[in-house]
Structures are given as C-alpha cells and as structure tokens.
Amino acid sequence: MARMPSGRVTSAKIVIAGGFGVGKTTLVGSVSEITPLTTEAIMTSAGVGVDDNRQVPGKTTTTVAMDFGRISIDRDLILYLFGTPGQTRFWFMWDELVKGAIGAVVMVDTRRLADCFAAIDFFEHRHLPYLIAINCFDGNQYHSAQDVRDALAIPSDVPVVACDARSRESTKQVLISLVEYVLTMRRQRAATPA
C-alpha cells in the first residue's frame, strides 16, 4: 500500500453498502478495532413483503440507520467505516452517510446480484469511487471476479475482490484495496490536464 507521509495521521471515511443481509454489519464488526456502533433492530411485520430474507432465513435483525467502526491501517492512516442500511425504505439516509467519504465498498452476494445494483448506481451517479467485494458465504458457489464484473456490467477499472466478511484480515485487505484504488484515481486525475 502507498505510504502516507510519516508523522502525520490521516483519517478517511469509507462507506460499506449493498443489499439486505449481504454482510455489511458483519464486515464492520469483524474489522473494527473498537466495539462497533450498530443500529440493529428486531425485524418486524413492517418488513413483510418488502425485505426478501429467503436467502438469509436465520436473519432476525436488520440495520435501521447505520453501522460505525474504526480501523487503523497503519500508524498513519485511520479509516472510519459507515455501514448503510440495506432495505430500500432506509435509502433516504444514504446521501447523509456518504458526505465526506473517499470511497465505498459495495458488498455482493452472488445469489442475489440484483440487490447491489442500486448501490452501484448510487455511487456512480455521485462519482464516488467504489469497489465490489464478493462476500463468499459458506456453501455459496464461487464466481470469478470477471464473471461478477460482467454480470454487473461495471467498468474495467473498478476493482472486484473476493472476501469473507467474517474475517478481519480478509476485510482489511478489501479496505486497503479501496484506499489504493482511490489514491490511484486521484493521481490519474491530477496528472490529466484540465
């Protein structure tokens, strides 16, 4: 990873997004070095007919505002993580959650690819750099990064990586990949004449 100037701590905001039950809260919880702040609520009848939990039948809670965590990538870089709620009825909060973010991780469950289209569209329309993180659930058929890229029709420069949202090291690598991508994009923009 590109080194930040030593002696100066840099912090950055990262948004973790994706569909309902894709692993956003799990990712924030697995990598955060502080006890994550979550806004999990018991699922109620308000979600009946709205939230499709057939692929996550054991899910009994859901994020209703955001998840928050923090990780020090090294002594010079601290990332603040903001997980979005996955249900469409909470998307009105996304504009506030992305203010000041340098980039986003879009979590993908390959059993429900369509659930991440809205997040991809959201970040593309706001020109916020993002990467795709394929959450490899137990028993989930693995699809190559290229297969997922093709299915989502995303640009070739957008990183697509596999991860296990339950693994601290795996999710840390996702975050490092996003920061490196953002830094590369910024350098390219700075080198391009206006």
Where are these regions (language model features)?
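Conserved nucleotide-sensing/catalytic segment adjacent to the nucleotide-binding pocket
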Residues: 52-88, 95-98
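Acidic, low-complexity intrinsically disordered regions
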Residues: 1-2, 193
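Canonical P-loop GTPase G-domain recognition
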Residues: 138-194
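Inter-motif core of Ras-like GTPase G domains
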Residues: 87-111, 121-126
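Conserved C-terminal guanine-recognition region of P-loop GTPase G domains, centered on the G4
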Residues: 107-157
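Conserved G1/Walker A P-loop phosphate-binding module
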Residues: 2-56, 70-74, 78-80
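Conserved beta-strand segments of the P-loop GTPase G domain that flank and frequently precede/overlap
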Residues: 81-84, 104-109, 132-136, 162-164
